[in-house]
Amino acid sequence: MLLSGKENMKKFLIITVLAFVSCFFMTNNMQEETKENVKDFEEVVATPTPEVTPTYVEPEIKEEPKDEELVKILDYIPDVVIDLKYATEENFTGVVIYESDEALLRYGTMKKLEKAQEELKKLGYKLCIWDAFRPKEAQFKLWEICPNPIYVANPNKGFSKHSRGNTVDITIVSLSGEKVEMPSGFDDFTKKADRDYSDVSKEAGENAKLLEKVMEEAGFKGYAGEWWHYSDEKEYPVFSQD
């Protein structure tokens, strides 16, 4: 059945009113949700952030060792070269004398060695350690292998100064670690080892004299028979490393 124009108009108005009412309620709901969201956001923003009090950590202050304490040279002179000959077979005995590969000295002696190192660096060199603290047990082993007081201190009559932790056997190298010409190698028992320097090259003699000058100014005394051997002028008792 066909509807009249009047009825069609009536139907159209009803649909329009329903659509309007529906849009009104949807818009109103959206506004309410927006208000709620804004309210929640404002509450979050308004909530004060709790203050965080920074925790202060007391820095660890290491107590300076006493002069008589044995310390690792590398802990204080990190750029020194360590080449302990008695910890290898590269020595006159051909055997390992002690197992430790750590160069140790009395703290008081180490400070003087540090001074020598700083002076040498100004001149383009640095120290190379061949031997430092030597346990008295190692001295007995050396004497057992070579019982000659000309070359090895007799531990039955008095220990080597190395066993006191205040003596080093050293040479110098360039700042890049390259070898420098010196009178002889380590544990050389010829006349080249003494401090006469008349039977070595001019360059070797001058380098040895430079080392001697720097070490003496730092507070060390050299041994006439070995250009590489230096002892702290301050004495310490014999030390046994257990």
Regions flagged by a language model, labelled:
Residues E32-W130, I145-D242:
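Extracytoplasmic cell-surface/polysaccharide-interacting catalytic and binding patches
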